[in-house]
């Protein structure tokens, strides 16, 4: 792929900026300008709230945890409380692996079944009102618990998805769910509030780039992005 570059003046010095840097900045600005959706526009009887891996092992401790992900808990908590009041169906995926999980060929051992890492963070578990679905891969769509839930809730046409990590488990689930509905020719909306999703930062995994890239891929595939959810009652 050919990468163009532009020369700009900064502090009396010439600097070259690659075109993809400019495009990323433009998309980042676009994301920051996304409007919030009001709860008045959410049809309770048609909606499912999905929380992906908001668990101790990715937020509070463990080899793959990142404390920055903690920032999503406040808006997630507020909407979960709203869902409980309005009887909106809610589910929470929990990464839960056997000690010989095939996924450990890609990621270091984490969230072993029965450990504290698999538990939903206390801020949300205290609220309750949601079904916990264990998963053994980065894609909760394939979990038997979710396939059963989906089969029993085909009347739902709006899935609001949040959690971590934006570019791994959230991305995989959203794409699979969207393409499933497309395959059976069912009109359904997958909605992602970007202030309720986050990913980790590491030497070869830039948080900002990973978030922006994943959100762009989701939007390209028909998933609706919003800045967040404004709760009005």
Regions found by a protein language model. Give the residues of each.
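Solvent-exposed loop/turn segments at secondary-structure junctions
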Residues: 57, 97-99, 166
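Short, conserved acidic/polar surface loops in the N-terminal third of protein domains
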Residues: 61-62, 101-105, 143-145
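A basic- and aromatic-enriched beta-loop-alpha substructure that forms the phosphate/nucleotide-
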Residues: 92-114
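Short acidic, Gly/Ser-rich segments with clustered Asp/Glu that frequently serve as metal-coordination loops
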Residues: 54-62
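Short coil/turn segments at secondary-structure boundaries
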Residues: 63-70, 107-112, 137
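Active-site-adjacent betaalpha module
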Residues: 2-48, 109-233
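Active-site loop/turn elements of alpha/beta-hydrolase fold enzymes
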Residues: 54, 95, 195
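A short alpha/beta connector and helix-capping loop motif
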Residues: 45, 49, 62-96
């Amino acid at each position: 792929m050919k990468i163009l570059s532009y020369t700009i003046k900064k502090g009396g010095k010439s600097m070259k900026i690659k075109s993809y840097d400019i495009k990323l900045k433009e998309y980042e600005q676009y994301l920051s300008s996304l409007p919030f959706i009001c709860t008045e526009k959410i049809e309770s009887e048609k909606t499912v709230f999905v929380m992906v891996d908001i668990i101790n092992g990715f937020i509070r401790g463990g080899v793959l945890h990142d404390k920055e992900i903690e920032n999503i808990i406040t808006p997630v908590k507020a909407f979960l409380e709203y869902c409980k009041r309005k009887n909106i169906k809610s589910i929470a995926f929990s990464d839960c692996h056997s000690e010989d999980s095939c996924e450990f060929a890609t990621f270091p051992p984490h969230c072993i079944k029965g450990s504290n890492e698999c538990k939903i963070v206390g801020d949300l578990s205290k609220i309750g009102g949601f079904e916990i679905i264990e998963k053994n891969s980065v894609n909760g769509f394939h979990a038997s618990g979710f396939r059963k839930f989906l089969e029993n809730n085909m009347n739902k046409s709006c899935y609001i998805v949040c959690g971590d990590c934006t570019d791994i488990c959230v991305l995989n689930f959203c794409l699979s769910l969207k393409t499933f509905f497309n395959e059976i020719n069912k009109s359904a909306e997958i909605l992602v509030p970007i202030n309720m999703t986050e990913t980790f930062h590491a030497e070869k995994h830039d948080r900002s780039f990973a978030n922006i890239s994943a959100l762009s891929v989701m939007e390209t595939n028909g998933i609706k992005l919003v800045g967040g959810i404004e709760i009005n009652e």
